[in-house]
Amino acid sequence: AECQYRGFESARKYIRQILNNFSFATPGTTYEVSPDYGMFVQAWNVSGYNIPLIHYVFGVDPMAYKKEINIKTDIPEDWEYAKLDNLLVGNNQLSIDYQKSGQQKSFVISCTENGWNLHFTIPVNCKSIKINGKEIPANSGSIDLTGIKNTIELI
């Protein structure tokens, strides 16, 4: 809810709180938070960091029944690198590799299956956009990606 209403920056402190209890009661994993002060089963904490990272930071909004994935990233400005690897969406696996160097942001978006429609929302403050090495108008709003692997460069 914090990500949805106030953004990821506001939610970061809660994610850190969850991760700070790593191996506290359950070796090799985070301590499950519940009203009775803990459970061995992981059920709730995963939603405390997976949903914010996948849905809000990487901006993945899948519609597997249509073989469609909308991507609207909101990666924090202080992150120089982030990677989402092999996210299962229907019979497909989506990977997003993000790198930032100065003002340039680069995304490599890949899938394991052909025939899926990926829609990438361009941030409003872009001056230059290249898709697979070809420049496109910076006022595109959203672009449709085809194929197994696509590279997006934003300035």
Regions found by a protein language model. Name each.
Residues 1-155:
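Non-catalytic C-terminal accessory modules of carbohydrate-active enzymes
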